[in-house]
Each structure stands twice: as C-alpha cells, then as structure tokens.
From Swiss-Prot:
Reaction catalyzed: L-seryl-[protein] + ATP = O-phospho-L-seryl-[protein] + ADP + H(+); L-threonyl-[protein] + ATP = O-phospho-L-threonyl-[protein] + ADP + H(+)
Keyword Kinase listed: yes
A UniProt-annotated Pfam family: Pkinase
Domain Protein kinase: 8-256
Name of the featured protein: Sperm motility kinase Tcr mutant form
Keyword RNA-binding part of the UniProt annotation: no
Its job: While the main function of Smoks is to control sperm motility, the role of Smok-Tcr, with reduced kinase activity, is to counterbalance a signaling impairment caused by the distorter/sterility loci, giving t-sperm an advantage in reaching the oocytes. Transmission ratio distortion also called segregation distortion is the name given to the phenomenon above-mentioned. Being associated with the T-complex, it allows males heterozygous for a complete t-haplotype to preferentially transmit the t-haplotype chromosome.
Native source organism of the sequence: Mus musculus (Mouse)
GO molecular function: ATP binding; protein serine kinase activity; protein serine/threonine kinase activity; protein tyrosine kinase activity
Comment field (misc): Encoded on the T-complex, a region of 20-30 Mb on proximal third of mouse chromosome 17. Naturally occurring variant forms of the T-complex, known as complete t-haplotypes, are found in wild mouse populations. The t-haplotypes contain at least four nonoverlapping inversions that suppress recombination with the wild-type chromosome, and lock into strong linkage disequilibrium loci affecting normal transmission of the chromosome, male gametogenesis and embryonic development.
Family: Belongs to the protein kinase superfamily. Tyr protein kinase family. Smok subfamily.
Enzyme class, first EC level, given as a word: transferase
SUPFAM superfamilies found in the cross-reference section: Protein kinase-like (PK-like)
C-alpha cells in the first residue's frame, strides 16, 4: 500500500466491476494522470486477476489499452494503465444517436486491427461490449478490460459460462462447447450493429427471453443500411459458430475495404525497447540509473522505472503539441534572442561553435548571442540527437499575441531574457555583457516528493524546448533586452 501511494496520488473512482474498481490517479513524479485498476485478492480468484495482467503484458498495439506498471501487495493488485481521454463507445453512440456508415467504418477498422492482433497472439477478449471500448477525442479507439480474457490454442473448445447476457452468443446460452475466437467475432457484430443503429440487438437480462429472441428473430438488420453492411452484420452474428468468419476474413470484406482508410499498424511501438538518450539523461538527474532504464524497457518489467519513462515521454509529447503564447512586441524593434550558455544548461549538454550545424532559425537571419564580450553578430547552431521537432512561424505584432515555435532538435535550445537597462547605446547596435558577469551554478535539488516533482518538471520543460524553467539557475547573471 505504501509503495503505491508513494508513487501515485489516488483521486476518484471512474469505474466499478465485480471485484475491482478503476480509479483516476496522478503520477507524483510527472503529474500525469493514469487509470488504476484496483483488484482485491480476497474478493475474487487470484489466477484470473494475474491473467489479466499477464495478457496486457503481452500486448503492444495502438488500439489496446497500455499497461504501464503492476504493483502487488498482500491484499491488492494495482494495474497502472494509460488514461483514455474520451468516452466509452456506449456514451459516444448515446450522444450521437447512431453513426453513419462512413463514420462507423474507421472505428470498426481499428477494432478489427486490435482483435486480429490479439488472436494472432493467442489472446481472446470474450467481453467485447460498447462499455469496454473507448473512443478518444481524436477518434482513436482503445479496447479495455481484459478481465474475462484468456489465452487459447487454435481449435480448443470451452464450456465456461462467463459472458454478460445481452452480448452472449447462442452457443454459450445453450451450454454448448464453443470456440473462444468465434465469441469475439460475435461481439464485433453486436458492436457494429450498435454503432449503426444505436440499439442493442438482443436487449434483455433474462436468459430464457434471450434464447427465445435469438431463435425467433435471428438477426433483423434495418433495410436502410447498405447491402454490403447488411451482409457483414449477418455474417458476424450467424448463430452457427462454424459459419462465422475469422477476424482476418472480416478485414477483407467489401464493406470494410471500401474507401481509402488504412488499418492501424500493429507494429507501432508504444513501449520502446531502447530509451531515448535525452529522456534517459533527464531521468538520470532525478536518480534513475541508465542501465536500469534500458533493462526495464528492453525486458518490459512493468516497474516504477518503466512507468516513469513512458509517462515522462507522453508528457513531453503532449507539451510540445501545445502552441506557445508569446508576449506582444514592438514591430519597430527586432527581438534579440540567444541560446543560453552551456555551463548554465541543466541537462549538461555542451556544444561549441565549431561543431556541425544542426539547428538554425528558419528566417536565416543572424542572431546576437548573449555571453562573453563581442563586437560582431554571430549565428550559433547546435547539433545532436533531436527527439522532438516543431515548425517555426513568427510574426511580431503590436498589442497582439502570436504563436512562436522552434525548428530542429529543440531539446538543446533555450532563450535568455534581455532587459533594457543594460543596452550599450554608444555601440553600433551591438550588445555585449561584462566579462565579470559569470553564471552561478544551480543550487542543489530540493528534497522530498515535491522536490522530485519540480525537478522532473524542469527537465520536461527543457525537453519541450520553449517552456521556461521555474527554477532560477542564473543568479547573479545580468540580462539585457531591447529598449522600446
């Protein structure tokens, strides 16, 4: 318990199951929100609990929820997973009424890609329902809750009754041995029908009524749907499991292949096997060992180190996607920007002017550099293993904010602030600083959780290239800015 709460702050309940709760939590080190499935051991079988964790450890697909860390105590198991910023498919359809075919197709393609990946790994979900599918704001689909999932061999039949009634297959309702992969195919049919009609085909909590509906109604598909879609739904929801297609066969159905959309790439790597050097270096400043970072990712240990790396990387990418609000400028005065001197850069990345050029401003203008005394304008550029790059687009305006972004490997850039009091008006527009002004080395990092959080925040801001650090590391250094 203490191990979990030392790393995460529990916030609120966002989901409830038979023997588990899903909580919203905050990772103390990065401030990133995560979803935590809390499973009480005494309230359910332990083997299925670990089975869900083991299944998620085997998966790495853009349309399957990512497991980041597993923390086990004497009484509970904590599954720390990425937080989906969106709604369940059920809520999404409830708000929309139902989806047009062109709207449903890209969502269904993502589901097919995820389930085909699972079946190729020998994993079956067995609980594909609109509540277990998340739709994020950008339209990406995520399959969640592998609590009823398991691993099987091709041709292996089961007779364990473990499904929710409205989505149960005929073979399960009539207590027949079943192929678990065909259970998922039926689930895909139920989900597709719900997307294009806004209704659950067989909606009852009674087993007897459900049996009668399946036998009597078969599968009534609205005539307003296209012929291809009607055919696909009937194939998916065939009451004879042997006649149901495999997921791979569904992926080449004419309705699925219509249009130019492509299926998600299952080889897309969400948990890298090798750490990014810049992120690893930032983590080194807060106590993580480089070898431990590499081993945790390569061996997929799902420990504190692996979770911290993945959440830090996610936070960096999220911050770099945000536009930066600049202060109003006087169009008659050219802004003077410069790169901070290497000795004051917290990540310890030192570059000299003799190294190969790798970062230039897009307007190709010379930029005065603040540092030692100089009477010439210089242009400095940096090179290095860039991780994050952003386009630059600057338009100085008066009394109006604008967006400024950087181009190139931006983790090595930082801009110093200039004050009007230090401009030397006797020079010909050149700026210099006193040689006696020496940068003061940054003070030691604060102790405790808050100190660690501030440290990782400062490191992330530097990696995000344009967000200023909250920590003051230039004490005693004079700064110069243009006189307006």
């Amino acid at each position: 318990m203490e191990k979990f709460h030392a790393q995460y702050e529990m916030l609120e309940t966002i989901g409830q199951g038979g023997c588990a709760q899903v909580k919203l939590a905050r990772h103390r080190l990065t401030g990133t929100h995560v979803a935590v499935k809390v499973i009480v051991k005494r309230e359910c079988w332990f083997n299925p609990v670990m089975s869900e964790a083991e299944l998620l450890m085997m998966t790495d697909h853009p349309n399957i929820i990512s497991l980041l860390q597993v923390i086990e105590t004497k009484k509970k198991v904590y599954l720390i997973m990425e937080l989906c910023e969106g709604k369940s498919l059920y809520q999404h359809i409830q708000n929309a009424g139902y989806l047009q075919e062109d709207e449903a197709r890209p969502l269904f393609k993502q589901l097919l890609s995820a389930m085909n990946y699972c079946h190729n790994q020998g994993i079956v979900h067995r609980d594909l329902t609109p509540d277990n599918i998340m739709v994020e704001k950008d339209g990406k689909v995520k399959i969640i809750d592998f609590g009823l999932g398991t691993q099987e061999k091709p041709g292996q039949n089961h007779n364990l009754f473990c499904e929710i009634y409205p989505f149960s297959t005929p073979e399960v309702l009539f207590n027949r041995p079943y192929d678990m992969r065909k259970i998922d195919v039926w689930g895909l049919g139920v989900v597709l029908y719900f997307m294009v009609t806004g209704k659950i085909l067989f909606d009852t909590a009674s087993v007897e009524k459900l049996r009668k509906q399946i036998v009597a109604e078969k599968c009534s598909v609205p005539c307003r749907l296209s012929v291809e879609l009607q055919d696909l739904i009937r194939l998916l929801m065939t009451d004879i499991p042997e006649l149901r297609p495999t997921v791979a066969e569904v992926m080449v159905h004419p309705w699925v292949t219509e249009g130019s959309g492509v299926l998600p790439d299952p080889c897309e790597e969400h948990i890298p096997l090798k750490p990014d050097p810049a992120i690893a270096k930032a983590m080194g400043f807060i106590g993580f060992q480089a070898q431990d970072i590499e081993d945790s990712l390569c061996q997929r240990k799902f420990n504190e180190t692996m979770a911290s790396y993945c959440l830090l990387k996610k936070q960096i990418l999220k911050e770099c996607d945000r536009p930066i609000r600049a202060q109003p400028m006087n169009p008659s005065v050219t802004p003077l920007s410069s790169l901070v001197d290497a000795p004051t850069f917290h990540l310890g990345l030192r570059r000299t002017e003799t190294e190969p050029t790798g970062l230039r401003l897009s307007d190709n203008k010379e930029v005065p550099v603040c540092g030692n005394s100089t009477s010439k304008k210089r242009e400095r550029s940096f090179s290095g293993p860039g991780v994050l790059s952003r386009p630059i687009n600057t338009t100085p305006t008066m009394d109006q904010t604008h967006t400024r972004t950087w181009s190139g490997p931006c983790i090595y850039s930082n801009v110093c602030t200039i004050h009007p009091n230090s401009i030397n008006e006797s020079t010909e527009g050149h700026i210099s600083t006193s040689a006696e002004d020496k940068p003061v080395h940054s003070r030691g990092w604060p102790r405790g959780i808050k100190g660690w959080t501030r440290k990782i925040g400062n490191a992330m801001r530097k990696l995000c290239c344009c967000i200023p650090s909250k920590e003051t590391s230039h004490l005693g250094q004079r700064r110069v800015c243009p006189k307006i």
